[in-house]
Structure formats: C-alpha cells, structure tokens
Amino acid sequence: MTILLAEDEPDVQLIARLSLKKAGFTVVTAGNGVEALERVAAERPDVILLDWMMPDMDGFETCRRLKADPATAGIPVIFLTARVQEAEVARAMALGAAGCIGKPFDALTLGQRVLEFVAG
C-alpha cells in the first residue's frame, strides 16, 4: 500500500516516513499542498496522510481539491495535525476526510492507525 505523506516539518516528515516504512508501507512525500497534488497525480497513492497547516496550500484546500476531482475523490485522506479541536475535526470530516491523527503521534502505532481509518 502506498501512502502520500504531505508534511512541511522535516523532523515530523522523517519520523512519520520511517514509521510507515517500518509498518510495510511505500511512502511518497510532499512538503506542501501544491506538491501533494502533483504527487497524487503522478503516483496515485492508496492513502493520503495530510498535514493541516502547510505553506502554499493548506491541508483543507488540498483535501477539498482532491475530493472535488473524480480521479482522486475515492482516495482516503487522513489529517495529521496538532490541532484536534472538535470544530476543526468536524470541518475535516465535512470535506470528506477518513479521520484525523493528532500530533504528537505514536510512531510505533502510526501504521496501524492509518489502517484503522482506511478500514472504516
């Protein structure tokens, strides 16, 4: 299973990437929403793990565009964020997200959390 990890913080991206690879995922990375859209078009990942706050295009706008495009609307989007307030989680879910994982996350169980959201 291929995951696109869109995260602008290099340390967080590294920890998440290594954790997901250790769990058996193939990981493609992007540093912002614009780059994430480009990578999705080129790579067609099975799941997208998306930070909310990124430069150039935030996660909300990235998710909105992904869900508006019939070619990518079916790819599960999971937000990875330090901001897990109820209103923001509700906004993410209204955009079509499969779920939200809070930061800091447990690197040992990140892959399992992703699978839980994808399985529904």
Mark where each language-model region is:
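Charged docking surfaces used in two-component/phosphorelay signaling
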Residues: 14-22
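C-terminal output helix
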Residues: 105-114
